[in-house]
């Protein structure tokens, strides 16, 4: 019967539309807050929870200085910076700049970086690419050439091999981070660059 088939079709379409009906904005926001663990009853705890927080933010870039002052503490109770270092050194989490930089002159603190699971870091870096990034300045280029030739180095080794002063090496590393050309195994290396040497209080 044609009328019966039409009714079945109409009922099916109506049911399918109901299943994909948009929710109210407040319900969507409630879902987002829970998904990102920023409500009191969904906040995470402990160092191992970092991988959960990072997974929900993977690929998202934020100012380097905001990760440990705002983003992670909002999601993880009693967050400790050492937790991120431990997860990075254990090979679980990595950090990098993904978007090309217009210049490397901006402060490291405001440089957009992303946290990601280390096992997927190559995928993110491949997607980002380094096309369009400006050339580093002379000192930054010197440091970059040393790292390219020697691989990962301790700061004192890098200072000695580059022939630059410690502050010059710090500034060069900051420029290379801002350009997205270098990163480190630990977040501690980036953390050390967030406050320029010239603005640090003496011990």
How would you label these PLM feature ranges?
Residues 1-203:
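Long, charged, low-complexity, helical-prone intrinsically disordered regions
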């Amino acid at each position: 019967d044609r009328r019966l088939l039409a009714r079945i079709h109409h009922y099916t379409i109506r049911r399918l539309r109901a299943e994909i009906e948009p929710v109210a904005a407040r319900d969507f926001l409630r879902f987002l807050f829970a998904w990102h663990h920023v409500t009191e009853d969904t906040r995470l705890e402990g160092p191992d929870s970092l991988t959960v927080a990072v997974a929900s933010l993977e690929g998202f870039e934020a100012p380097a200085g905001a990760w440990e002052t705002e983003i992670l503490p909002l999601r993880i109770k009693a967050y400790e910076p050492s937790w991120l270092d431990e997860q990075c050194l254990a090979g679980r989490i990595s950090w990098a700049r993904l978007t090309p930089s217009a210049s490397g002159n901006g402060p490291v603190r405001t440089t957009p970086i992303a946290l990601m699971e280390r096992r997927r870091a190559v995928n993110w870096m491949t997607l980002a690419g380094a096309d369009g990034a400006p050339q580093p300045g002379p000192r930054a280029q010197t440091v970059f050439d040393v790292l390219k030739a020697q691989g990962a180095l301790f700061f004192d080794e890098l200072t000695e091999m580059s022939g630059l002063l410690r502050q010059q090496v710090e500034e060069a590393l900051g420029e290379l981070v801002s350009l997205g050309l270098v990163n480190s195994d630990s977040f501690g290396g980036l953390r050390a660059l967030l406050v320029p040497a010239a603005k640090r209080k003496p011990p």
